[in-house]
Swiss-Prot record:
It is found in: Secreted; Secreted, Cell wall. This is Class I hydrophobin C. Residues 1-19 form the signal peptide. It comes from Agaricus bisporus (White button mushroom). Belongs to the fungal hydrophobin family. Keywords: Cell wall, Disulfide bond, Secreted, Signal.
């Protein structure tokens, strides 16, 4: 009788182990990726479209792409939420960092960060 229980347990054990979930795979929908495809991640207190800032951009010698944002008073963010680099304003990905007067970052795109 004991040998039948032992054999049944030995046969069932590999089946149970093979059906166990393993770590890794695809991230769930709540995973936040704080990575820019192009450029660097910044926290900008103000963003303006170039049509609102053409006069200021021309005076400061800053060339901006049409449709992109200009970032004002920006600070770099290494990883959101780590090391005290939290962004109370709008996090943006910027292609160029040119410190020409008031404009800190050029060609910025806002990113959505749901924490």
């Amino acid at each position: 009788m004991f040998s039948r229980v032992l054999v049944a347990a030995l046969v069932a054990l590999p089946v149970l182990v093979s059906a166990s979930p393993t770590p890794g795979g695809y991230p769930d929908s709540t995973t936040v990726v704080s990575q820019c495809n192009v450029g660097e991640l910044h926290c900008c207190n103000t963003q303006q479209t170039p049509d609102h800032t053409n006069a200021a951009g021309g005076l400061l010698g800053a060339a901006a792409n049409v449709g992109a944002l200009l970032g004002f008073d920006c600070t770099p963010i290494s990883v959101i939420g780590i090391g005290g680099n939290n962004c109370a304003a709008q996090p943006v990905c910027c292609e160029a960092n040119e410190f020409t007067g008031l404009i800190n970052a050029l060609s910025c795109s806002p990113i959505n960060v749901n924490l």
